Amino acid sequence: MPGVRVKEAEPFELALKKFKKQCEKAGILSEVRKREHYEKPSIKKKKKAIAARKRALKKQRKMID
């Protein structure tokens, strides 16, 4: 869990920036978006297969160039 200790002379904006960076590194926002709506396992599997196919095509195109 990200947390930031704010020093007396430290501006709030800087502390907020540090907190946002820690949240991004921890992957909290992406996890929240992912869990916002329930996704059936079959749909997850389809999306995973489509992503794998896209990666393979991209890799293949890169090899040709």
From Swiss-Prot:
Keyword list, A-Z: Ribonucleoprotein, Ribosomal protein
InterPro entries noted in UniProt: Ribosomal_bS21 (IPR001911), Ribosomal_bS21_sf (IPR038380)
PANTHER family per record: MITOCHONDRIAL 28S RIBOSOMAL PROTEIN S21, SMALL RIBOSOMAL SUBUNIT PROTEIN BS21
Classification via HAMAP family: Ribosomal_bS21
Cysteine-cysteine disulfides: none
GO cellular component labels: ribonucleoprotein complex; ribosome
Name of the molecule in the record: Small ribosomal subunit protein bS21
Range of residues in the leader sequence: none
GO molecular function, one term: structural constituent of ribosome
Pfam families (alphabetical): Ribosomal_S21 (PF01165)
GO BP annotations, alphabetical order: translation
The keyword rRNA processing appears for this protein: no
Organism name: Geotalea daltonii (strain DSM 22248 / JCM 15807 / FRC-32)
Family, per entry: Belongs to the bacterial ribosomal protein bS21 family.
UniProt keyword annotation of GTP-binding present: no
Gene field: rpsU
